[in-house]
Regions:
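N-terminal, polar/charged subdomain of small-to-medium soluble alpha/beta proteins
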Residues: 1-107
């Protein structure tokens, strides 16, 4: 999976880049059909924000997290995306198991 990292008012150091890659590549354990991700790291006066847009088959997923520490924001972002990816995977697998109401109706 390709991960693009952009920084607003923050320099993306190699350590920060490696941390983002390590945390967000774990999402592939939950779902194999991840095509790409765009991560934006932003620093304002008192908060560090991490946002990510994840391209999956049949849609896109978005999550953001705010914290006083950038690494904590990345951790929270990873947790939010993991929940969204598992929910998306369950939607796709459960959708194919549905049967029509018409076939189950009693004549």
């Amino acid at each position: 999976m390709q991960i693009d990292i952009t920084g607003h008012h923050v320099d993306i150091t190699p350590a920060l880049r490696n941390y983002v890659h390590a945390k967000l590549e774990r999402l592939e354990r939950h779902f194999d059909h991840l095509t790409g991700m765009h991560v934006v790291l932003t620093v304002t006066k008192l908060e560090h924000r991490a946002e990510a847009t994840l391209q999956v088959n049949h849609g896109k997923l978005f999550a953001d997290a705010v914290d006083s520490d950038m690494y904590a924001a990345i951790d929270a972002l990873s947790d939010k995306l993991a929940r969204q990816v598992t929910k998306h995977k369950e939607k796709l697998t459960n959708h194919s198991d549905r049967t029509s109401v018409r076939t189950d109706a009693v004549p």
